[in-house]
Amino acid sequence: MSSVPASAYLTLAIILFCIGLFGALTKRNTVIVLVCIELMLNAANLNLVAFSKLGLFPNLTGQIFSLFTMSVAAAEAAVGLAILIALYRNRPTVHVDEMDTLKG
């Protein structure tokens, strides 16, 4: 059995999610916003692993779903960075406020 209580995992996940949410809502740099979204996804993964390991009937379902979520997050980051590079070639800025128009 684990010596770390479940509340410690959940508290850490809440803190990580709140930091990611704060960064995603307040920062204007697109790269930082993508990193904050990844931080929020990692907090959700921590919850999945904690509940699957420390639940009443421990099984691998949460851990497998967490691996699936990590692969989707990697694809999301790759697509997001590709879009960011394409936008940066047309307009040399990475700020969210200046990327609200499609033509320009």
Swiss-Prot record:
Annotated disulfide bonds: none
Role of this protein: NDH-1 shuttles electrons from NADH, via FMN and iron-sulfur (Fe-S) centers, to quinones in the respiratory chain. The immediate electron acceptor for the enzyme in this species is believed to be a menaquinone. Couples the redox reaction to proton translocation (for every two electrons transferred, four hydrogen ions are translocated across the cytoplasmic membrane), and thus conserves the redox energy in a proton gradient.
Catalytic class of the enzyme: translocase
Any GO molecular function: NADH:ubiquinone reductase (non-electrogenic) activity
Membrane topology: Multi-pass membrane protein
One Gene Ontology term from the biological process aspect of the record: ATP synthesis coupled electron transport
Transmembrane region(s): 4-24, 31-51, 67-87
Cell location: Cell membrane
Family: Belongs to the complex I subunit 4L family.
Keywords, ordered alphabetically: Cell membrane, Membrane, NAD, Quinone, Translocase, Transmembrane, Transmembrane helix, Transport
Primary site of residence: membrane
Lineage: superkingdom: Bacteria
EC number: 7.1.1.-
Name of the protein: NADH-quinone oxidoreductase subunit K
Entry GO terms, CC: NADH dehydrogenase complex; plasma membrane
Oligomeric form and interacting partners: NDH-1 is composed of 14 different subunits. Subunits NuoA, H, J, K, L, M, N constitute the membrane sector of the complex.
Catalytic activity: a quinone + NADH + 5 H(+)(in) = a quinol + NAD(+) + 4 H(+)(out)
NCBIfam families documented for this protein: PRK05715.1-2, PRK05715.1-3, PRK05715.1-4, PRK05715.1-5
